[in-house]
Regions:
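Conserved kinase catalytic-core helix
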Residues: 99-135, 147-152, 157, 168, ...
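Active-site acidic catalytic loop and adjacent metal/ATP-binding pocket
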Residues: 38-42, 139-185, 193-196
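Active-site activation/catalytic loop segments of kinase-like enzymes and analogous catalytic loops
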Residues: 184-231, 246-260
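ATP/Mg2+ or Mg2+-diphosphate-binding catalytic cores
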Residues: 249-291
Length: 291
């Protein structure tokens, strides 16, 4: 889930060239840094990357295009090196550094826009569910009935921002049939954020969470997110978020390290597992204050 996550900053400009889909033009590639499991190259208005995972993903992206879903990559085909070609989403990426310090990430406008974007995505995806259930996906289906296609990692660091607001979402490698609420837990966790620190609006800095000072504001923002999505705040939203962090953030990092995955081993060495374990303990201690 987290292992091998792509970073967003540019590394170098490579002078490799390739033909575009029409075969009529050569474009230079700019390699994106940070993808230890997959190199990603930008060329003009397209992104070229090694194909990851299941064949259903391309069908899903084509379906979203047919449904007119804006702000997601379009699948354009396969290049001569066997890499998938996707449209590039212009804008700025934020939130990969935790804690997120950019003021726009803590604004009500951003939070509401995230909720509305996820609702549009889930509504557009729901019609693909009957076909999707015929395929094998990278992530297992949930035990409960599926109601949409989950992005699988809809955290703020996978959104594209313009003018301080989220306008696009990329990295659909973890997409799978699932439930809307399960998919929303990652957005909720990363956007509030549901962590042991909080954003001080007066100082515009992060500080330690205080139940007396911060519980009401955190509750307000959680309810704002779900209201913007178009549903009442589910009573089990914090419980599901804790389960998601335990299973996908902590569990898969441990499993990957045990299997020798160098990226997971590095992330644990850097303290990321310890961080998410603290987040999990924080949710279990204080989550009841926010619903």
């Amino acid at each position: 889930y987290l292992c091998g996550r792509k970073a967003t900053e540019w590394l170098i400009v490579m002078q490799n060239t390739f033909s575009d889909r029409s075969g009529s033009q050569k474009l230079p590639e700019e390699m994106l840094a940070g993808g230890s499991q997959n190199q990603v190259a930008k060329a003009g208005s397209t992104v070229h990357r090694r194909i990851q995972g299941h064949p259903a993903l391309h069908k899903y992206l084509l379906y979203l295009e047919k449904e007119g879903m804006e702000g997601v990559p379009r699948f354009l085909g396969i290049d001569e090196e066997g890499r998938e070609i996707l449209t590039y989403l212009p804008g700025e990426t934020m939130g990969r550094d935790f804690p997120p310090t950019h003021p726009c990430l803590h604004s009500d406008a951003t939070l509401a826009a995230l909720g509305r974007f996820m609702r549009r995505l889930h509504d557009a995806s729901a019609g693909f569910l009957p076909e999707a259930l015929r395929f094998s996906w990278k992530s297992p289906f949930p035990d409960e009935p599926c109601d949409t296609i989950c992005h699988g990692d809809a955290a703020i660091w996978n959104f594209v921002f313009q003018g301080g607001l989220p306008v696009g979402l990329f990295d659909f490698d973890q997409a799978h049939p699932g439930t809307r609420l399960w998919d929303l837990t990652t957005t909720l966790f990363s956007a509030i954020p549901l962590t042991y620190f909080t954003y001080d609006r007066e100082t515009q800095e992060m500080r330690e969470y205080s139940p007396e000072k911060d519980a009401a504001e955190r509750r307000r923002r959680i309810h704002l997110f779900f209201t913007s999505y178009g549903i009442p705040c589910p009573r089990n939203s914090i419980e599901l978020t804790a389960l998601r962090i335990e299973k996908d953030f902590c569990g898969q990092m441990r499993e990957g390290a045990a299997a020798g995955d160098e990226t997971c081993i590095r992330m644990i060495r850097e303290g990321q597992l310890r961080h998410y374990e603290k987040v999990l303990a924080h949710l279990r201690e204080h989550g009841g204050e926010w619903i």
